[in-house]
Amino acid sequence: MTGILAEPETWVAVAFVILMGVFAYFGVHRTVLKSLDNRRDRIKAELDEAARLKEEAAALLAEYKARRASAEREAQEIIAGAKDEAERIAAEAKAKLEDFVARRTKTAEGKIALAEAQAVADVRSAAANAAVAAASTILSQSVKGQVAEGLLQRGIEEVRSKLN
C-alpha cells in the first residue's frame, strides 16, 4: 500500500476527487451549468436576431427592387409622354407655320394682283391722256372754229370712256 501512496498520480487523483467534492458541496456545477445555459440562451437570441435582421433586410431589398422597378416604369412613361407631347407640339407648330405661309402667300398674291390692276389702270389712263392730247393737237390743227370745238369735246369724251 505504501507503493500506491508514494505515486504522485494517486495524490493527484485524491486531490481531484476532493476538489470535485468541494465543488459539489458549494454547487459550483450549478453555477457552471447556469453560465453555460445563459451563454447558450444569449447565442440563441443573437442567432434569432440575426435571422430576423436577415429577413428584414430581404424584405427591404425586395421593397427597394419593387420601388426601383416602379420608378423605372414611371420614368419610361414620363419619357414616352414627353415624346408624344413633343411630337404633338411639333405637328401643331408645323400646321400653324403652313397656315401662316399660306395666308402670307395669299396676301402677297392679292397685293400683286392689286398692283397689276393698278399698273394696267395707270397705263390705260396714261394711254388715254396721250391719245386725247394727240387727238386734240391733230383736230385743233386740222379743224378750226365752233365745229372743231364740238368734235374735240365729243372725241375726248369717247376716248376717255373707251380707255377707262
Swiss-Prot record:
Protein name as it appears in the record: ATP synthase subunit b 1
HAMAP family for this protein: ATP_synth_b_bprime
Gene Ontology molecular function: proton-transporting ATP synthase activity, rotational mechanism; proton-transporting ATPase activity, rotational mechanism
CDD domains, alphabetized: ATP-synt_Fo_b
Coiled coil: none
Any one GO CC term of the record: proton-transporting ATP synthase complex
Membrane topology, record value: Single-pass membrane protein
Domain of life of the native organism: Bacteria
Entry's transmembrane regions: 8-28
Subcellular location: Cell inner membrane
Role description: F(1)F(0) ATP synthase produces ATP from ADP in the presence of a proton or sodium gradient. F-type ATPases consist of two structural domains, F(1) containing the extramembraneous catalytic core and F(0) containing the membrane proton channel, linked together by a central stalk and a peripheral stalk. During catalysis, ATP synthesis in the catalytic domain of F(1) is coupled via a rotary mechanism of the central stalk subunits to proton translocation.
Source taxonomy: Bacteria, Pseudomonadati, Pseudomonadota, Alphaproteobacteria, Hyphomicrobiales
Gene: atpF1
Family: Belongs to the ATPase B chain family.
Record's subunit section: F-type ATPases have 2 components, F(1) - the catalytic core - and F(0) - the membrane proton channel. F(1) has five subunits: alpha(3), beta(3), gamma(1), delta(1), epsilon(1). F(0) has three main subunits: a(1), b(2) and c(10-14). The alpha and beta chains form an alternating ring which encloses part of the gamma chain. F(1) is attached to F(0) by a central stalk formed by the gamma and epsilon chains, while a peripheral stalk is formed by the delta and b chains.
Alphabetical keyword list: ATP synthesis, Cell inner membrane, Cell membrane, CF(0), Hydrogen ion transport, Ion transport, Membrane, Transmembrane, Transmembrane helix, Transport
